[in-house]
Each structure stands twice: as C-alpha cells, then as structure tokens.
Amino acid sequence: MANFFVRLWESVFEPGTSPQLIIATHVSFVALLLTLIWLIYATNGNIHFYALFCISLLLWITVIWFINELSHVKLKDNDELDKDANKKDDSAIKEDSEDKQESGKSTSTARRTQAQSRSRKA
C-alpha cells in the first residue's frame, strides 16, 4: 500500500500517465459519486445534488476520454522540447531578417516612384 503512494507521488513528476495515477483518479471519482448518491438519499432528492452528480459523472467521462487520448500521443521530454524551441527561434529570426531585407527593397522602390512622380509634376 505504501508502495502505491510512493509511485503515485513519483508519477506527478513524470510526463504522461501512470497506472497509479489512473487508479487514484478512478477511486476519487467513485468516492465522489458515492458521496453524492448518499447526499441525494439523505436530502430526499435535492435537485442540487442531482445536478452535482451529473456534472461529476460528465467530468469523469471527460477525464477518461482525455487519458485515452493522451495514451495515443507521443510525449516529448524536456530535451526534445528545448530543441524544438531553438529550431522555432532560429527560423523566426531568419524570417525576420528576410522580411527586413524585403521591406528595405520595397521602401527604396517606393522612394524612387515618389521621386519620379514629383519630377513629372514639376
């Protein structure tokens, strides 16, 4: 039992999901839903607890869906994320310098056009 909690705590610092995290999630939602069922019974069917039960059930379904989608995606570690960020930064710098060169060319062309139109008017 203690090993479960140790692995659960360690899984917090790892990317992705672990079996301990999934089990803890399901146990938490079952406890929440059982508590809401008991509150519905204890309050003779208070509508607010029905609403909370529905919201909790839909949230649990959404979390299950998200966990399944997350298991299909390849997660990147920090080194891969740094490499991708550096590539994006390098390409952005390169694009900015190309844009500045092109805008400099278009500015000089616009100046020549303005000078020509002034000389025609004179």
Swiss-Prot record:
| Places the protein is found | Endoplasmic reticulum membrane
Which residues does the annotated region (Disordered) include? 82-122
Provide GO CC annotations from the record: endoplasmic reticulum; endoplasmic reticulum membrane
Keyword Endoplasmic reticulum annotated: yes
Q: Where is the composition biased (Basic and acidic residues)?
A: 82-103
Which loops or segments lie on the Lumenal side of the membrane, by the record? 42-46
Domain of life, per UniProt, equals Eukaryota
Its membrane topology, per UniProt?
Multi-pass membrane protein
Membrane-spanning segments: 21-41, 47-67
| Keyword Membrane found | yes
Q: Where is the composition biased (Polar residues)?
A: 104-122
Which InterPro entries is this protein grouped with?
Pkr1
One GO term (biological process): vacuolar proton-transporting V-type ATPase complex assembly
Residue intervals annotated with topology Cytoplasmic: 1-20, 68-122
Q: Which UniProt keywords apply?
A: Endoplasmic reticulum, Membrane, Transmembrane, Transmembrane helix
State what this protein does. Answer: Functions together with the other V-type ATPase assembly factors in the endoplasmic reticulum to efficiently assemble the V-type ATPase membrane sector V(0).
- PANTHER family annotated for this entry? V-TYPE ATPASE ASSEMBLY FACTOR PKR1 (PTHR28251:SF1)
Further remarks about this protein from its record: Present with 5750 molecules/cell in log phase SD medium.
**Which family does the record assign?**
Belongs to the PKR1 family.
For this entry, the protein name equals V-type ATPase assembly factor PKR1
Q: Which organism is it from?
A: Saccharomyces cerevisiae (strain ATCC 204508 / S288c)
